[in-house]
Each structure stands twice: as structure tokens, then as C-alpha cells.
Amino acid sequence: QSLQDTAKRMIDGGKKVAYLSNDVMQHSFYASLPPTEHGSYSVAFLKKHGLPPARQVRIGVEGVSERLRRSVSKPISDEDLIGCTRWLNANGKSVRWFMIAGLPGETDEDWQHLRDIIQRWKTLTPKGVLALSFTAFCPDPATPFATVALDDGYWTRFLDFREWFFSGREWSNRVKIMQPQQPDSRLKKAMLSMGLSELQLREGGYISPNSRLLYPYA
């Protein structure tokens, strides 16, 4: 209770508070702590305890479509994503979606899906700011997609998306986009992380020497 009271007093006084722990969510009292600028909270928690003072709320969306999000066990529906964003906008918060470009299995249709939900958000939300930050998928050792072949198709799909965004009536100063890493820089990062050659990464199926885990499907 003392920690809760102290945190609330500091936040109400305009202080920036961060909870430091190896795993803050393991503590039984975590759910009762006041939300801070930096933290991970459910919409239900924020509705009950109030929004943090931060002007922007970041959402780790991952895939550019609902189909891709389900494939990586993060089944955020379009309705929930748009609804949550609209609610935050209505409460004076700008929102940033963090998305991964080039998840395994990504197609042109997934990016069309993203265009559609951006248009829906714009139609349903007369006031508010939405930013989209893209990160290029990069394999890491000991992860489920570590052995998937590296594919640069995401970059062409992003360029098409960017052209759509800036070239016509779809453009809006209420929507901001930050591009993912280009293929060359993504490749360098993957080679360093995985300890594999470009040929091995593009062929796929190779287990990283930096990995301590062996997946049965690799």
C-alpha cells in the first residue's frame, strides 16, 4: 500500500515514475499500481484506473493484418485495434502502432488489409493522431521463425503502401508512417544475429550456431 500511495502521489505531482523489477508483473500487487508513462496495460485496467500522463500510447500490433497477427499468437482483431485506438484518441492521446513488415507468409493482400483499416480509422475518428512504425522482420536465434528463409519482398510491398499513402486522397497529416529497415541493413543485422551467411539465410533451414535450442521442425 505504501508503494501504491507513493507512486500515485508522485504521478499526481507531475513526476515520471518507472517501476524497476526483474519482472514487475510477477508481484501480486502489480495490477493495483497506478499506470505510468512506461508500462504494459490492458484496456480494462486503464479504463478502471485512468490513463497515464503520457501524450502518446504505443501498441505492439506486430502483423500488418489480423491473419498475420494470429499466425504469431497475437490475435488482435481489427475491431479491437480500431476501437482501442479511437478510445485513446477520444481521451486526448495520440497512438502509435508498432508493426513488423515481412513476417513469414506475408502477401500483398495483408498490406491491402492494412490500407483498409487505416481508412476505417480515418472515417470513424474525426479527431486524433495515428502513427505507424514499421520494423523489418529479422530472424533471431532460438525463436520459432529462426530457420525461415529470408525474403526481401516486404520492401516492395512497403514501397507500394507508401506510394498509396502519399500519392492521392489517402494522405492525411493525422497519420504518420515510419519506414522499416531496407533489405541491405536488415541482412547485415540478420547475419550478425544468426551467425550465418547470406546464402544460408536466403535458403533457410539452417540452425544458428548462436542458438542453444533445437526446434524439431528445423
Language-model features: locations:
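Auxiliary Fe-S-binding modules of radical SAM enzymes
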Residues: 4, 8-12, 29, 89-90, ...
